[in-house]
């Protein structure tokens, strides 16, 4: 992926820690950011200490920010975002979440993706103390919360699940937590239920994307009352639900989510990639609807929706149903090609280690879905895996799914 990123995005300098230098095989200049003396390549600290004699402008212009997409479907894309002149969009985060100055926070969200990167900037602006670790370890996170009496946790749903699994009975004292902020991937009803049962009803939701930053936010009370919501539209954000022709759909009807704000992307570093825009609004790539209380509900990725025998099926709904099934530790649903129905639902499940997991069968999974969803949502293919392939944000990477066991 690194070679692909360099080629597609026109990268002409690579900055690395020297522990990764053996993985680098490129034709572009390499600069060592953290050096233990093991490499003879140029060092970042020497460059900083010996700058060229260039006169800088007294009032420099803001430069664009480039963030990389998560790369779940292929090579990560370089996303160009403007630096906002006012923090209007981010105001919705501190308005929705009880995140205040001088608090102590646990940051699990990956700092090289938009959620962690945005939170670092907010935390620095609020003079927060940030506790973070190089690699996520559930026991270490729980110990950090207990030891440092942390006020908040910034993370993603898959990590909440790991925390609950490690400490369901409250062995660690986490009573200091005033909020848990979630973003990065879908916050499902089952994750909300388990997380709030362990930590109290302090889970807040933030929905957006690397391309378009913040779309909606939901308070802890709103999430507890209705775990299916993504939240209300953030301040400074314009959001519309449009059909395939780019026309607004009626309230309550599913369509593609389009939005814009002052931090929305202006383009890609790869000039060959194009934005999907309608009247200045950019598609976030998800399907959803606005309910009668102005809450946004996200039903899945626009390119994930499949048609089974003429019926629309959202794989995310199958995933959410199966997350509540005894014996399932993790699960992912998606579409595969079918010669008769054009497409069909497939499920990749990781059984639990207990008796329920050992007794789990493909037919039991199908029966569970059949009792809760329409017949066209019942998976034809069921694969049992040791674990689901995930990226640093906790998202499942579909192209890496394999069929360890099929039934």
Features from the language model and the residues they span:
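Conserved AMP-binding A3 loop
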Residues: 64-88
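Conserved helix-loop-beta element of the AMP-binding
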Residues: 10-13, 26-42, 104-106, 151-155, ...
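ANL superfamily adenylate-forming
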Residues: 19-66, 75
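AMP-binding/adenylate-forming catalytic core of the ANL superfamily
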Residues: 14, 145, 153, 261, ...
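Active-site loops of AMP-binding adenylate-forming
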Residues: 83, 197, 209-228, 243-245, ...
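Conserved ATP/PPi-binding loop(s) of AMP-dependent carboxylate-activating enzymes
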Residues: 232-236, 245-278, 311-313
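Conserved AMP-binding/adenylation subdomain of ANL enzymes
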Residues: 87-104, 112-152, 166
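Gly/Ser/Thr-rich phosphate-binding loop
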Residues: 151-154, 165-226, 238
């Amino acid at each position: 992926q690194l070679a692909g990123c360099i080629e597609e995005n026109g990268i002409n300098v690579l900055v690395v820690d020297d522990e990764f230098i053996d993985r680098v095989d490129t034709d572009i200049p390499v600069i060592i950011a953290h050096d233990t003396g093991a490499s003879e390549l140029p060092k970042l600290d020497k460059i900083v200490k010996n700058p060229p004699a260039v006169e800088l402008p007294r009032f420099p212009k803001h430069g664009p920010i480039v963030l990389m997409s998560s790369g779940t479907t292929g090579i990560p894309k370089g996303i160009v975002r403007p630096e906002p002149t006012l923090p209007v969009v981010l105001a919705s985060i501190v308005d929705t979440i009880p995140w205040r100055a001088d608090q102590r926070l646990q940051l699990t969200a990956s700092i090289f993706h938009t959620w962690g990167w945005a939170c670092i900037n907010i935390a620095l602006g609020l003079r927060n103390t940030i506790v973070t670790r190089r690699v996520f370890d559930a026991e270490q996170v729980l110990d950090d919360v207990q030891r440092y009496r942390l006020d908040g946790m910034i993370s993603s749903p898959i990590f909440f699940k790991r925390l609950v699994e490690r400490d369901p009975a409250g062995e660690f004292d986490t009573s200091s937590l005033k909020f848990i902020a979630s973003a990065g991937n879908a916050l499902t009803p089952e994750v909300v239920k388990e997380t709030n049962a362990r930590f109290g009803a302090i889970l807040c939701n933030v929905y957006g994307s690397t391309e378009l930053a913040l779309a909606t936010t939901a308070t802890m009370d709103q999430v507890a009352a209705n775990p299916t919501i993504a939240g209300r539209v953030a301040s400074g954000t314009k959001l519309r639900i449009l059909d395939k022709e780019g026309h607004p759909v009626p309230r309550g009807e599913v369509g593609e989510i389009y939005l814009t704000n002052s931090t929305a992307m202006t383009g890609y570093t790869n000039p060959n990639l194009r934005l999907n825009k309608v009247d200045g609004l950019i598609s976030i790539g998800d399907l959803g609807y606005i309910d009668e209380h102005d809450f946004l509900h996200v039903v899945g990725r626009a390119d994930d929706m499949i048609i089974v025998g003429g019926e629309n099926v959202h794989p995310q709904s199958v995933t959410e149903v199966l997350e509540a099934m005894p014996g399932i530790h993790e699960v992912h649903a998606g579409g595969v090609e079918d010669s008769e129905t054009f497409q069909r639902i497939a499920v990749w499940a990781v059984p639990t280690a207990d008796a329920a997991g050992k007794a789990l069968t493909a037919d039991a999974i199908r029966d569970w879905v059949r009792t809760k969803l329409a017949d066209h949502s019942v998976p034809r293919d069921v694969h049992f895996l040791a674990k689901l392939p995930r990226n640093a944000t906790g998202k499942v990477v579909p192209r890496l799914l394999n069929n360890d066991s099929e039934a």
